[in-house]
Amino acid sequence: MKKKTAALFLTGILFLAGCSSTAGNTTASSDKTEATSASSGNTDQGKVLVAYFSASGNTEKIAKMIADDTNADTFVITPAQPYTDDDLNYSDENSRVVQEYENPDKQTIELKTTDVPDWDSYNTVYLGYPIWWQDASWVVKSFVQKEDFTGKTVIPFATSMSSGLGDSGKNLEKLAGTGTWKEGERFSSSASEDDVKKFVSGNN
């Protein structure tokens, strides 16, 4: 048991990925399922959507910066059963997220909705998620498996404390099976607006 607990603690450090130390942000966006429209969604990338899942608020912060910079609409990917602080306690081997990590059959997450308004009208989708155990959160994987990205350019972005983007974008591309996927970017919790602007300009 001690070895198992130690292993969970070590992998849990990587899980901190998109998890902020500010607990109050954990479910701040959990009830938002509709796409929020910008005044225009048009840039050099065509009509843009920023779709994201944020466990603690870090991914949401980056998503909003991207949306502001691209004049994009936003869509919050929301689990039907939102994650609580206790659910996200990586150091507790009985917590929801650890149980899901250790049991891949539990990683197909029911979402509140996958019906993105005017989905077919978007040319570019920025797809945001926290890194959990060196890969994309399985919440966003469940979203990707439900959507058809045909004809769209998909640009992943992730948040983590220390882990890089790794193969998370490539793994999502394989799950999707459609769309033109770009390399993507990983941001820390301290990422600035300038960091985000460089990321966006590099994808125009």
Which residues fall in each region the model found?
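Active-site-proximal alpha-helix that buttresses catalytic centers in soluble enzyme cores
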Residues: 2-8, 20-204
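Long, proline-/serine-/threonine-rich intrinsically disordered regulatory regions
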Residues: 11-12
